[in-house]
Amino acid sequence: GDNKPPKKGPPNGCFGHKIDRIGSHSGLGCNKVDDNKG
């Protein structure tokens, strides 16, 4: 279940439209957020 997006918001936005552009090059995507957590 690591490849599944968070229960908050749709898989298209994950965190929202704020991280949408940041996660693009930051790696904070749906299934990438867990890897970059720490």
From Swiss-Prot:
GO terms for molecular function: hormone activity; toxin activity. InterPro entries: Natr_peptide, Natr_peptide_CS, Natriuretic_peptide_brain. Its main location: secreted. Keywords: Disulfide bond, Hemostasis impairing toxin, Hypotensive agent, Platelet aggregation inhibiting toxin, Secreted, Toxin. Changing residue 9 to A: Important decrease of antiplatelet activity. PROSITE patterns: NATRIURETIC_PEPTIDE. Changing residue 3 to A: Little decrease of antiplatelet activity. One of its GO terms (cellular component) is extracellular region. The keyword Chloroplast does not apply. Coiled coil: none annotated. Changing residue 10 to A: Important decrease of antiplatelet activity. Residues 1-38 are annotated as: Disordered. The keyword Disulfide bond applies. Disulfide bonds join 14-30. It is found in: Secreted. Mutagenesis was carried out on lebetin-1-gamma. Belongs to the natriuretic peptide family. This is Lebetin-2-alpha. It comes from Macrovipera lebetinus (Levantine viper).
